[in-house]
């Protein structure tokens, strides 16, 4: 259908999120009406390729487009994601308690997960992550089974995703597993090793699947897909530019400071952060409970760590990468609940 064709064409030509296909075409359509001649100062369109991705989402997108339009595709995706969301919430309620189900629901609503099915590229990671949560919660799982599942999830994510919010497929199933009663009984520093090991396993599956596409695409097309992929890795992890600003850490921090200071928000936010840290320190139950909650704390830090490693990509595409913070909210709420108790503040004040 024409609208879908237009969107595909726009995506093909529009890499910069802050320009549109219309802006590019305007250079070629406009005339110098004073001279009656076509404009000759149009910038050249630089060709690019997405051959480094598997584009696995086409497995369900193309068949659906044979029987429906893009609206129908969205309806199917909404139904699938709603069913998976409900399944995760019900299983969390049944196996981990009402609080866990509420944490999950709140975290996903805060990042507008309900909007993800509107776009195929946003839908993929949420669907894969929720499916992983359902598998984890279906019955008690051993740590080695979970690590193997994370390997599979890494492969599936790499196959279907376009580097949107892949960390969700690692963190959400892992948090669901850590919240299960039998894992809470074993909670502690040992599980931190499982979190790290599971993350490495997921990363191996993710990277190997992705790299295999580079090799196969190069063999089939004769193009140097590996060089292009490695170049893109460098672009997304090194300092690039955004709105004319080089994305070094110094420039990023200076931009944040000047933006907040210009709105007289910097020092109030600093004060709020200091107060929150003081409240956190004063409300910690004890060191043992803090250690038991530490694996959940590590999961909460996965998304910030991902943003730091891929800072250029995360900032330039912040309009969709921010939804990965749903993992931080989910794991963070669980971490705070297990290691903190506001009643501890009153007890400590009485002692002083």
Label each residue range with its predicted role.
Residues 146-174, 194-208:
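Membrane-interface alpha helices of multi-pass inner-membrane proteins
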Residues 78-102:
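Transmembrane-helix motifs of polytopic, lipid-linked glycan transferases
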Residues 52, 59-77:
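Juxtamembrane segments of multi-pass membrane glycosylation machinery
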Residues 278-301:
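Membrane-interface helix-loop-helix junctions at transmembrane boundaries of multi-pass membrane enzymes
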Residues 316-340:
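Hydrophobic/aromatic-rich transmembrane helices and adjacent perimembrane loops
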Residues 195-276:
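Membrane-lumen/periplasm interface segments of specific transmembrane helices
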Residues 59, 105-128, 153-159:
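Aromatic- and kink-enriched transmembrane "portal" helix at the membrane-lumen/periplasm boundary
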Residues 1-50:
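Interfacial juxtamembrane loops and adjacent helix segments
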């Amino acid at each position: 259908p024409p609208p879908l064709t237009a969107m595909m064409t726009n995506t093909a030509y529009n890499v910069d999120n802050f320009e549109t296909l219309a802006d590019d075409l305007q250079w070629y359509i406009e005339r110098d009406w004073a001279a009656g001649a076509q404009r000759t100062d149009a910038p050249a369109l630089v060709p690019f390729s997405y051959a480094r991705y598997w584009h696995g989402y086409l497995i369900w997108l193309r068949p659906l487009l044979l029987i429906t339009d893009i609206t129908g595709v969205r309806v199917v995706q909404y139904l699938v994601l709603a069913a998976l969301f409900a399944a995760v919430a019900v299983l969390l309620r049944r196996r981990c308690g009402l609080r866990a189900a509420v944490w999950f629901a709140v975290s996903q609503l805060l990042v507008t997960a309900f909007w993800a099915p509107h776009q195929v590229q946003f839908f993929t990671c949420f669907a894969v992550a929720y499916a992983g949560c359902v598998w984890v919660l279906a019955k008690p799982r051993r740590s080695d089974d979970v690590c193997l599942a994370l390997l599979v999830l890494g492969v599936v994510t790499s196959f279907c995703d376009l580097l949107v919010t892949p960390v969700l497929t690692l963190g959400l199933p892992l948090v669901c597993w850590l919240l299960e009663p039998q894992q809470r009984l074993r909670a502690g520093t040992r599980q931190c090793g499982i979190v790290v090991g599971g993350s490495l396993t997921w990363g191996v599956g993710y990277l190997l699947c992705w790299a295999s596409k580079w090799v196969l695409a190069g063999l089939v097309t004769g193009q140097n897909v590996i060089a292009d992929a490695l170049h893109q890795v460098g672009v997304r992890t090194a300092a690039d530019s955004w709105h004319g600003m080089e994305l070094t850490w110094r420039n990023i921090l200076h931009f944040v400071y000047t933006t907040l200071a210009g709105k007289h928000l910097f020092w109030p936010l600093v004060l709020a952060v200091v107060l929150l840290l003081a409240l956190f320190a004063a409300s910690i139950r004890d060191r043992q409970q803090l250690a038991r909650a530490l694996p959940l704390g590590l999961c909460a830090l996965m998304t910030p760590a991902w943003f730091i490693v891929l800072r250029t990509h995360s900032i330039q595409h912040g309009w969709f990468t921010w939804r990965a913070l749903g993992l931080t909210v989910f794991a963070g709420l669980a971490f705070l609940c297990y290691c903190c108790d506001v009643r501890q503040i009153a007890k400590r004040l009485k002692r002083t």
